[in-house]
Structure formats: structure tokens, C-alpha cells
Amino acid sequence: MKSYHHLHETRSLRMHRIVEERYRETPDDVIRFGLENLERWQQRGVDCDDFRIWEEILRFVPQRLPEILSGSSEEAVRLRQSSPFAGLIPEAFRQQILTTSL
């Protein structure tokens, strides 16, 4: 039986691979989407160190996105837990990913 943590990471990785595909198709749109989410969260008073790291990546080194979105490093796994791409994947498709990851 898979642990909850392993299942959560598997689902997260699958969703972020879709974000990576979108990034390869329309990088500016994906970057803008992530920055807008970060800005909105900051305006609501939601903040954490990883959000600042995401902002740096999106603004200054977006070429790192593929490694973060689908990589297996500790940093990639950690950053995906605070991803600024919430809402990028349509809800119906997201639900399909969640149910097929069981």
C-alpha cells in the first residue's frame, strides 16, 4: 500500500508535468499565470520563503522551470508543494488526474 505522502507526490508530479507541457507551448502565459497567483496571494497576506523562490525563478531564471516542474531533487519536490500554478489545469482534467493516480 502506498503512503499518503507518496500518493500526494505522484499526483503533484503528474499535474506539474502537464504544467511543464503548457510551459513548452506558451512559456510567457505560464510565467504570467504563476506571477499573478503569487501577487494575488501576497496581497491577501499569504507568504512563505518558497513563494519568493518561485518569484525569482519565474522572473529571472524561467529556464529552470522544467527541472522544478518534473524533477526529483529535494528542491523540486519541496517547491511543487507551494506551486503558483493552482488553477492552471482545468478542474475536470485535474479531477481525472487525481482519480487515475490511485
Spans of features found by a protein language model:
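Basic, alpha-helical nucleic-acid-binding regions used in initiation and control of genome expression
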Residues: M1-L102
